[in-house]
Amino acid sequence: MSQGPPAGGVLQSSVAAPGNQPQSPKDDDRKVRRREKNRVAAQRSRKKQTQKSDKLHEEHESLEQENSVLRREIAKLKEELRHLTEALKEHEKMCPLLLCPMNFVQLRPDPVASWSAHDAPDHPSFIWLGTLV
């Protein structure tokens, strides 16, 4: 009949496991040094992980603030667009140029009518005065 561990915990044996020799003081020292080295490495790893987590949290907070600022700017620009669209609609009702039967008004004579499309300057000789959709 085998005996289990005592009521308070683990059964300890002074006999080495089969195939193992009893621990020498030199082996004990190595084991202690290895455990200490492992403990220090684990502390370093946990500290590094905590620092990385803190950095990500700070970056998240910063991005949330930037996002909030950009959303407010978008709302402001949408309101400005709505206001300008309304102003344009009101202006179109009264603009004499839009009531004219011609949709194009020449701003200046075209001095370079012979230019090809790739030679022409960036500014057009004609401007469309119709409504934009």
Swiss-Prot record:
Residues 30-55 are annotated as: Basic motif. It is found in: Nucleus. Ubiquitously expressed. One of its GO terms (cellular component) is nucleus. Residues 1-68 are annotated as: Disordered. Residues 51-68 have a biased composition (Basic and acidic residues). Residues 56-84 are annotated as: Leucine-zipper. GO terms for biological process: dendritic cell differentiation; myeloid dendritic cell differentiation; negative regulation of transcription by RNA polymerase II; regulation of transcription by RNA polymerase II; response to virus. AP-1 family transcription factor that controls the differentiation of CD8(+) thymic conventional dendritic cells in the immune system. Acts via the formation of a heterodimer with JUN family proteins that recognizes and binds DNA sequence 5'-TGA[CG]TCA-3' and regulates expression of target genes. Required for development of CD8-alpha(+) classical dendritic cells (cDCs) and related CD103(+) dendritic cells that cross-present antigens to CD8 T-cells and produce interleukin-12 (IL12) in response to pathogens. Heterodimer; heterodimerizes with JUN family proteins. Interacts with JUN. This is Basic leucine zipper transcriptional factor ATF-like 3. It comes from Rattus norvegicus (Rat).
